[in-house]
Amino acid sequence: DAIAQLLNEGKVQLFCADSIDAESLLAGDTAPRRRAEMQEKYFNYLTSELAPRILTLNGAKKDTLLWAVGVDTGAYQAVNCRLRRPEVFAGAIGLSGLYDVSRFLGNAADDLVLRNAPLAYLAEEGLVDKKLLAKAEENALLLCAGQGSYEGDALVDTQAMADALTDCGLPVHLEV
């Protein structure tokens, strides 16, 4: 109901991308490097295939803005897309996100894992175009997490992501 009017007026559209977490992040029986490879393929699908397809389907004007939104590992995907491809995604909303992907991919031991580990790559110089991101709209990154007993990892990760963004001088809006 909160966005019903915007949807009805055609000002906002929602698209849902299927996840491949079972073959990537959550594939516990698969080597971390292979999980990172699958994650990179998914990232490329979202940014190089799905996003352009959404714009094409709608005959989008040049100023059309895409936002990525997700919950749990989807929040990680949304924020990762925004940080790595700010020219494609104007913003991201992460809800109860799990941003410390070392629990899925291991430590950022190689460039492929590092490219998909925002808490790690935000700390590395030259991996994210911070100047481009800093020019983005205020609050183009929104992070939210609840405080229930089941939110433990998400609450810790959400705070860590907000801190990492702030340390880089990137605007973030945090709600916990």
Give the positions of each predicted feature:
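Non-catalytic cap/lid and distal C-terminal segments of serine-dependent acyl enzymes
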Residues: 1-176
